[in-house]
């Protein structure tokens, strides 16, 4: 609705010819417009449209110059231009401008004058009668705009001549009296000086005998003999030779009377006759007015040096090029402003620290549908080695706040709600959180991995082992502060570098506490299945459904399995009472699980751990080198694979789980029965694993030495 009108082909040229900063008409630009319009078939229509737009300008100079351009087009562009000027659109624009009370009086008079000229020009063509109708309406609505008709040039009668002669005689008589009055005071002044020197008594009566005669003003005459100046009230254009042209406001010097209503005068070096009804008579200035005018003129001439200095400064400043005239300078100024803005914005928002990125393998298409819209994978977060603390018992409250607030998409479920599982970064997330495949039997033999933290979007975590393990991605809601995220086991064919050093971490309890093992807040809620297992690979459901397909783990380890090694001294960390706070998944509601070996879930929903003896701190587990962690891709029809399947426990030979009687916890602490005993890989209970001679096997322990805990799911 407020869209600006499209620019016409003549807008630029007409705008240049009617520039408001011009002091007079630019006839070169006007004649160029006339030539273009005369050679263009659509020129009259397009040019009149541009003229209508310029008439709407609020500057009086623009309006006057536009009328001059229209008059020049009417005289140089033929009948087609006459038809466009007599159109309803152009005449309505003229009437609207003339009837506007804010329009300057001079513009209104010029409109009336041009419409009268065009009416006289178009009167021979009946098709152009719209201009005459518009002129008649304007003259009726504004009678004061039209100047009076010039009087007839009638010769002076004898009576007129006698009246003029009488006025001339009276003026001469008054002039002589004024001269005599000026001479008498001049003669009396020299006579008063000698009489004052001889006797002051005679000077008083002589002065009293000459009363002061009042100065009588000269009566204003009505003839050319007594009137010396007149001021023009209207513009007058001569129609015959010998007439004097003048504009409104010009002061004309009267010379003589030629006709009854026409006088002869002089203006700007030109002499001619002019009608009396176009001017008003001016009274002659009094001596005081003449003296005041002379004083003002002297003041102006006294500042002639300053005037010359000002003219010099103006002429010197105009010669220098302006910045906006130079295109290169304008571009440089704009570029400098952009640079300063960018510099200021970069200083106000400094960039965050940059860390190494995870090495990503080429993704192999595997099994999960696209992720849902409400779950996102938080990027990894930087954590130093000193912050990988072993969590305290579940009954102690967490004293560390989460490293980052949970996203807005997550909601804390109630005790009976079913939360969504968490997934490894780089893997696709299932579209529905209830469609969770069970884990494979290979996941039962897993090495302890670093805990999962809530990650911040702009930071990366570099573990202390020198290698970057695959980050764990969660899409579940945060549980209460006292719960921990379940341990996520690797599944790759090569072992990643652990954040706990070259050996297992020595703990203060008789069992191995997973850094992310949760404490179930709901007694009736079972432990969740693995997020990366297919439905036919869940060790919990598979054991309950088909005991014949999954053999139980032997109670006696093979003789080829070495004893567990002691952890590195620099990575041994005691279990303090202030554990770190991690980003946890709420424990889901699921059927309680009973292990094939008889270890089941208690009434509290936690897992029973096999009692073990103390760890052997004198052996060290071998570590492979040259491994790079990568998030596992998923295949649409196959199981999920993880880079952690390359652990020695995946490559090692057969081994058996540790089982047996319980042992007291280290440091005198009672054993914690809520964890499941560690089930080593390569045993007969885990079918499908590689043979024992493919690589080093995970350390297994007899019944008294099994302090490793298996994967929670």
From Swiss-Prot:
Listed Polar residues bias regions = 471-512
Q: What does this protein do?
A: Component of the ESCRT-0 complex which is the sorting receptor for ubiquitinated cargo proteins at the multivesicular body (MVB).
User: Where found?
Assistant: Endosome membrane
Q: Which UniProt keywords apply?
A: Endosome, Membrane, Protein transport, SH3 domain, Transport
Q: Where is the composition biased (Low complexity)?
A: 186-195, 202-213, 442-457, 514-524, 680-704
Membrane topology reported for the UniProt record = Peripheral membrane protein
UniProt source species:
Chaetomium globosum (strain ATCC 6205 / CBS 148.51 / DSM 1962 / NBRC 6347 / NRRL 1970)
List the protein's name.
Answer: Class E vacuolar protein-sorting machinery protein HSE1
Domain UIM intervals: 163-182
Q: Principal localization?
A: membrane
Family, similarity comment: Belongs to the STAM family.
For molecular function, the Gene Ontology terms on record are: phosphatidylinositol binding; ubiquitin binding
- Which InterPro entries does its entry note? ENTH_VHS, SH3-like_dom_sf, SH3_domain, STAM, UIM_dom, VHS_dom
Q: Give the span(s) annotated as Disordered.
A: 141-165, 179-223, 345-713
């Amino acid at each position: 609705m407020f869209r600006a009108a499209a620019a016409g082909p003549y807008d630029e040229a007409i705008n240049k010819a009617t520039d408001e900063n011009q002091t007079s008409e630019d006839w070169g630009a006007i004649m160029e417009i006339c030539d273009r319009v005369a050679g263009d078939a659509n020129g009259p229509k397009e040019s009149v449209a541009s003229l209508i737009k310029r008439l709407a300008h609020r500057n009086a100079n623009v309006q006057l110059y536009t009328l001059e351009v229209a008059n020049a087009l009417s005289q140089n562009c033929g009948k087609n231009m006459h038809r466009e000027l007599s159109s309803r659109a152009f005449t309505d624009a003229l009437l609207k401008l003339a009837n506007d009370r804010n329009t300057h009086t001079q513009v209104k008079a010029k409109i009336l004058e041009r419409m009268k000229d065009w009416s006289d020009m178009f009167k021979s063509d009946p098709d152009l009668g719209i201009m005459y109708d518009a002129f008649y309406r304007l003259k009726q609505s504004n009678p004061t705009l039209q100047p009076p008709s010039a009087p007839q040039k009638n010769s002076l009668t004898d009576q007129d001549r006698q009246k003029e002669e009488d006025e001339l005689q009276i003026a001469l008589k008054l002039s002589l009296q004024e001269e005599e009055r000026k001479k008498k005071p001049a003669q009396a002044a020299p006579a008063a000086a000698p009489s004052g020197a001889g006797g002051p008594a005679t000077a008083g009566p002589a002065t009293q005998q000459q009363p002061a005669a009042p100065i009588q003003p000269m009566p204003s005459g009505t003839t050319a003999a007594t009137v010396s100046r007149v001021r023009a009230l209207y513009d007058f254009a001569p129609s015959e030779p010998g007439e004097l042209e003048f504009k409104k406001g010009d002061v004309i010097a009267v010379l003589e009377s030629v006709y009854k209503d026409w006088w002869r005068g002089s203006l700007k070096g030109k002499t001619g006759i002019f009608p009396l009804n176009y001017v008003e008579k001016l009274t002659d200035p009094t001596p005081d007015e003449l003296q005041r005018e002379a004083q003002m003129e002297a003041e102006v001439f006294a500042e002639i040096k300053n005037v010359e200095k000002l003219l010099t400064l103006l002429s010197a400043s105009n010669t220098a090029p302006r910045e906006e005239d130079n295109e290169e300078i304008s571009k440089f100024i704009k570029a400098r402003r952009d640079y300063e803005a960018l510099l200021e914005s970069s200083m106000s928002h400094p960039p965050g620290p940059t860390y190494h990125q995870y090495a990503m393998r080429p993704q192999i298409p595997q099994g999960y549908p696209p992720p849902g819209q409400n779950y996102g994978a938080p990027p990894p977060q930087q954590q130093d080695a000193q912050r990988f603390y072993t969590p305290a018992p579940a009954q102690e409250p967490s004293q560390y706040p989460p490293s980052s607030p949970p996203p807005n998409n997550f909601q804390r479920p109630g005790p009976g709600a079913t939360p969504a599982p968490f997934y490894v970064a780089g893997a696709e997330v299932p579209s529905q959180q209830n469609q969770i495949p069970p884990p494979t039997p290979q996941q039962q033999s897993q090495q302890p991995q670093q805990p999962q933290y809530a990650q911040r979007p702009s930071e990366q975590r570099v573990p202390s082992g020198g290698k970057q393990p695959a980050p764990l991605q969660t899409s579940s809601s945060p549980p209460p502060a006292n719960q921990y995220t379940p341990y996520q086991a690797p599944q790759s064919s090569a072992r990643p570098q652990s954040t706990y050093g070259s050996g297992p971490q020595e703990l203060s309890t008789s069992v191995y506490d997973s850094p992310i093992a949760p404490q179930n807040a709901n007694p009736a809620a079972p432990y969740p299945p693995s997020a990366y297992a297919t439905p036919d690979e869940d060790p919990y459901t598979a054991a309950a459904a088909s005991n014949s397909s999954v053999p139980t783990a032997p109670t006696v380890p093979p003789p080829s399995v070495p004893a567990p090694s002691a952890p590195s001294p620099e990575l041994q960390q005691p279990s303090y009472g202030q554990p770190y706070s991690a980003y946890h998944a709420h424990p889901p509601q699921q059927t309680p699980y009973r292990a094939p070996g008889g270890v089941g879930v208690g009434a509290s929903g936690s897992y029973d751990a096999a009692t073990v003896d103390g760890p052997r701190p004198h052996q060290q587990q071998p570590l492979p080198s040259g491994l790079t962690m990568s998030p596992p891709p998923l295949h649409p029809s196959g199981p999920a694979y993880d880079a952690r399947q390359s652990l020695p426990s995946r490559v090692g030979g057969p081994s058996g789980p540790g089982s047996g009687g319980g042992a007291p916890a280290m440091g005198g602490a009672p054993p914690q029965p809520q964890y499941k005993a560690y089930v080593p890989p390569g045993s007969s209970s885990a079918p499908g694993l590689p043979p024992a001679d493919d690589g080093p096997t995970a350390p297994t322990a007899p019944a008294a030495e099994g302090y490793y805990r298996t994967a929670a799911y």
